[in-house]
Amino acid sequence: MTQPQVYAKLVSMYIFDKYGIQLKFKEMFSRGKDCILSEEKFNLIKECSDFIDILDKRIKCFDGNLTEEIYVKTLNAELKRFGHWDNGTFIANNPKQILGVVVDHMSLVKATTGRTKKDEMDAISRSSVILRNTTKIMSPIHVAQFNRSAGSDERLKQAMQDPTSNDFKDSGSLYEDSQVVLALHSPHKFKLSTYKKYDIKTLEQCFIAIFLLKSRFGTSDIFVPMGFYGDCSHYIEIPKPDEIYDYEKYKDPYWILDKEDNINKSDDNLIDQTSKFVL
């Protein structure tokens, strides 16, 4: 995505969290039929100017072809803003600061002379490990695509749609080098009507399964059922299937606002809460 698109996604998240209003990506850019931005919602975006200023200070986007050479050169240049090297050791200006580096996504990495696309992906993964371990403040996040064999007819017949480590496309090193691996799976795209007792026929693309495939910090092989709401760029954990009596309710994100209205936030630390996974 381009920087304006990234900002639009983040602003849509902010608007929903603060005002409880969904502002579509297309509407924000007045793209498509019946997607003209109204004056009311334009004023709403202007009220987000302070938030956008924060994005300007904290986010830097790089477009164009990506190779390992470009990746390392760019990150080393950026690191100079946050510290310096001393005899091979990186001294951070603020050791508590974390720099998130997102590559979206790895399948768009370009092959170079003498290297295949897989070689470049492996090299970027290897360099990310080095930067992560030597700087102590850099956290590379690599977005990758599953191998298409994950959707093979044979796997569907055997009810083996869940993601595994074998599904990562082009680069096994990416999985091996990662400390944490999250996988997203859409049962609707596989034309499933039910999935782990959830009514996918009703939820359709609003249901996304997130799997913690790997974690060097604790338990892995964890499944989290999520509601995906693209108009406000939110993933929100939904209840267990035996706790859902109206699936239509979970086709938009307003159910979480209704729930928050019933929470006494001043007593939040005094009672047991069911944790929710929200992106």
Language-model regions, residue ranges each:
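Structural recognition of the conserved hydrophobic beta-strand(s) that form the central parallel beta-sheet
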Residues: V102, M138-Q145
